[in-house]
Amino acid sequence: ELKGEPCVSIDTNPSPKKNICTSRSFGVKVTEIQSLKESISSHAARCAEKLREQKGCARYISVIIKTNPFNKLDDYYCGYKTINFNVPTNDTMDIVGAAETLLDSIYKKGLVYKKSGVIVGDIIPQNQIQLNMFETDQNRIKRDSLNSAVDLINQSIGRNTVHIGSQGIAKVWQLKQEKLSPCYTTKWGDLLRVRC
């Protein structure tokens, strides 16, 4: 603002995204494919959730895994692969399944990974999907209602209350959150204890 005149207008209705990326650096050294699968599954499920929020479907998915580029003791590796979906989708099962398949093809044993991510792109509105001749509308309706129910539960109770098993439970790979504020209203362990 200059002299009460707005210089930049605020866009209250942003246009839908063409690509969605979810990625995180690991809080610990990750070498096992199981930990990578948990992180990739979590990122893929979050991408699917974001797609449904904007009522879109993705035509392709990419998976990326990286080692630490600043570690001079180890070789740098960046694995990246993309595949197209037969039919554009926002279904969590389809997206997670494709992401895990891509991870299996780019994973190299013996490396210490620092970061993983999932990108879905070429997003179109979900009401403009053209089905192939082998997919029935009934299957899509069942999966859509399942995804809607899971999204509703997660929105009302909390993120990842209901999730795919491949996302894991412990999530030791997650980013360190040492300075996180306590959640007094949502976590029993964070409640204040008073002693008399």
Where are these regions (language model features)?
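Acidic, metal-coordinating catalytic segment for phosphate/diphosphate chemistry
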Residues: G79, N86-C196
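DNA-contacting surface of Y-family translesion DNA polymerases
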Residues: E1-G110
